[in-house]
Amino acid sequence: MFFGNSLPFNPEQDIPSLAGKVILVTGANIGLGKQCVLEYARHQPSLIWLVARTLDKAQTTVNEIHQQLDVKNTPPIKPLAMDLSSLSSVTTAARTIVAESPRLDILMLNAGIMAAPPGLTNEGYELQFGTNYIGHALFTKLLLPVLEKTAAIPDADVRIISLSSHGHVYAPKEGVLFDTLRTDAESLGAYGRYGQSKLAIILWTRQMARKYPQFTLASIHPGVVRTNLMNNATGSPWVIRVLGMVANKVVTPVDQGVKNQLWASVAREVKSGEYYEPVGIGGPQTPKGEDDALGLKVWEWTEKELQGYE
């Protein structure tokens, strides 16, 4: 499914040569993340980091991609383990990149969970907020040395693309309830917790764009895409889960649904800090997505929480 006024985008034709570039994709063992790696690999970057929750999952996907593409013409793809619900795992993964990667041109923050049951991350954050938002915020923060070094290279074009969702409209009316972020936030419901995490991504992206003008950042909604995200939405009411599985038969296939994030990672028209519906349609669907006072509060809260991981 695509939206009115969607921009035309053909990954095969519209992704330019990626020669010399290094790309990293989180949540890359399945769905949109795996499709991103496949599409990027066809344009010959110097290296792709394929990140999954476990090294076995990452390596299995690397092997699958090598089987799907002509191995002789496939760029190096390195598997990397990172569990976003564990900030120690995030820290370890980021240190590996900083130590081993000479540059980083595209950072695709693709991984996430949806409508999970109430729970906490290893460090005690609400599970969806911690996984979808905090883990990626820390990962990006720790990668700043290599991102800034890359941005200083002549003609470099550093992109940081975050998967948000149209589901940010389900966030609480206040936007982000800070007193729930170190609880399981059961009272918000599965989709309230999900919406809160996805709204935070939009707000963080806007703040990052202001503070790091040398990068191009965007948050995106991929559309309603045929992935296993809804199958794992075990915290959602059973009726919604069933409808989601039925909808999976008719919604956008992954090779089409991936277009918005790929577009955001290469297109010249991207406005840094913007949120995009597919493909290339700008603007949050709720006023809270453009609330810069709330965004600054989210930024300051996040910076305080992540002190000590630098």
Regions found by a protein language model. Give the residues of each.
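Intracellular terminal tails of multi-pass secondary transporters
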Residues: 1-19, 285, 289-310
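Rossmann-fold NAD(P)H-dependent dehydrogenase/reductase core
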Residues: 2-231
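Residues at helix-coil transition
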Residues: 42, 99, 265-269, 307
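Pocket-edge positions in alpha/beta enzyme catalytic cores
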Residues: 50, 82, 249, 287-290
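Residues within alpha-helical segments
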Residues: 59-62, 95, 206, 258, ...
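A short C-terminal helix-loop "cap" of Rossmann-like NAD(P)-dependent dehydrogenase/epimerase domains
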Residues: 72, 183-184, 236-246
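C-terminal helical subdomain
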Residues: 90, 197, 244-284, 292-296
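Short active-site-adjacent structural elements
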Residues: 167, 283-286
